[in-house]
A protein has these predicted regions:
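Glycine-/small-residue-enriched transmembrane alpha-helix faces in small-molecule transporters
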Residues: 1-39, 75, 147-176, 194-201, ...
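Juxtamembrane helix-entry segments on the extracytoplasmic side of multipass membrane proteins
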Residues: 3-8, 31-35, 39, 62-68, ...
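Hydrophobic transmembrane alpha-helices of multi-pass small-molecule transport proteins
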Residues: 49, 71, 111, 121-143, ...
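Helix-helix packing/entry segments at the starts of transmembrane helices
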Residues: 40, 82, 95-103, 170-194, ...
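Specific transmembrane alpha-helical segments of multi-pass solute transporters/efflux pumps
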Residues: 17, 21-22, 50-101, 134, ...
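C-terminal-most transmembrane helix of multi-pass membrane proteins
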Residues: 1-2, 9, 42-43, 51, ...
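Specific alpha-helical transmembrane segments that line the substrate/conduction pathway
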Residues: 36-47, 76, 85-124, 129, ...
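Transmembrane alpha-helical segments that form core, pore/gating elements
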Residues: 49, 108-110, 146-219, 252
């Protein structure tokens, strides 16, 4: 029982960290493009996990037979998910993206039921998820009725959601094969960085720099780089995103998925907007509105329903 509570705290820690990433990323966007942040973040994470592996000794990953899993994890959980979400925000508004992506846990549950041995899909889980989605909508819209269908961006947001669902299924596959989560995550980061190389080259060209308001720009100007990389706050945010939000959180997420199952673990993602609102209020001085409080309460009720059974918490 104690170990389950400890693992539950692990989920809470990941949610808190991921809830803060929005503010950290927003601070870095003053000096860096979205793509540059992505590369810096996962490069640092890969180096950190590689160093830990060397200190612990090489882990058995089954030679090359598991590489397709790592490559697929890198593509679905990092490259496709991050790119689709960033592009979706460009073509639609942030509220649309937040609401559409919040359907992720239900989609993940459906995928898990169809493709894995995970059978946690139930009426309570679906009902709780729908209640949580209503809460996310209240927090995201915050009294401004601005949800309108914008096909290109909305489809991208839905694809991002589906991509994360596939990543969750791949985590389950890696766990079923007994692969060390640290190894699986580190290798998936490596594959994602390899896949980003063509985008990085394109980002140095004029068309790449101008695309999506500079979201994919890669700045090679020495003067600009000296200035932005000499900023201590930038390094603190990069370290947070790379070491905590990527290296530590992705490994811990894989561990708790092994213990609780990908469906129940993914339900906890509904709590991320609550953390984001609280962090913005405490550290950025933003006001918390009545709708955000109500929305947060609705999310908590939905999560409680989705993660319990008649006899109590699963």
């Amino acid at each position: 029982m104690i170990s389950r509570y400890i693992n539950g705290l692990g989920i809470a820690l990941v949610i808190v960290i991921w809830g803060v990433t929005f503010a950290s990323t927003r601070a870095l966007l003053v000096d860096f493009s979205s793509f540059e942040i992505l590369v810096l973040r996962f490069s640092l994470a890969w180096v950190a996990l590689w160093g830990i592996e060397r200190l612990r000794g090489s882990a058995n990953v089954g030679k090359w037979r598991n590489e397709w899993i790592f490559a697929a994890m890198g593509f679905t959980g990092i490259v496709a998910y991050q790119f689709l979400e960033n592009c979706a925000i460009y073509y639609t508004n942030a509220s649309n993206v937040a609401i559409l992506v919040s359907f992720g846990p239900i989609v993940t549950a459906l995928m898990a039921r169809a493709l894995t041995k995970d059978r946690q899909l139930s009426a309570r889980l679906v009902g709780g998820s729908l209640i949580s989605i209503c809460g996310v909508s209240l927090v995201s819209l915050n009294g401004i009725v601005e949800f309108e269908l914008r096909p290109i961006g909305d489809v991208m947001a839905l694809c991002a959601m589906a991509s994360w669902g596939l990543y969750s299924i791949l985590i389950d596959e890696a766990n079923e094969r007994g692969i060390n989560p640290l190894v699986a995550v580190r290798k998936s980061f490596g594959w994602s960085l390899i896949m980003m190389i063509p985008v990085a080259i394109w980002g140095m060209t004029e068309s790449g720099i101008c695309a999506l308001d500079g979201s994919f720009a890669v700045i090679v100007d020495a003067g600009v780089n000296v200035e932005r990389f000499s900023n201590l706050i930038n390094w603190m945010n990069i370290a947070f995103l790379g070491l905590l939000a990527s290296a530590a959180s992705f490994v811990l997420w894989s561990v708790v998925c092994r213990i609780f199952g990908v469906v129940k673990t993914t339900i906890s993602l509904y709590l991320t907007p609550i953390v984001g609102v609280i962090f913005a209020a405490v550290f950025l001085g933003e006001d918390i509105t009545i709708l955000e409080v109500v929305g947060g309460g609705v999310i908590l009720i939905g999560v409680a329903i989705a993660t319990t059974v008649k006899g109590g918490v699963k």
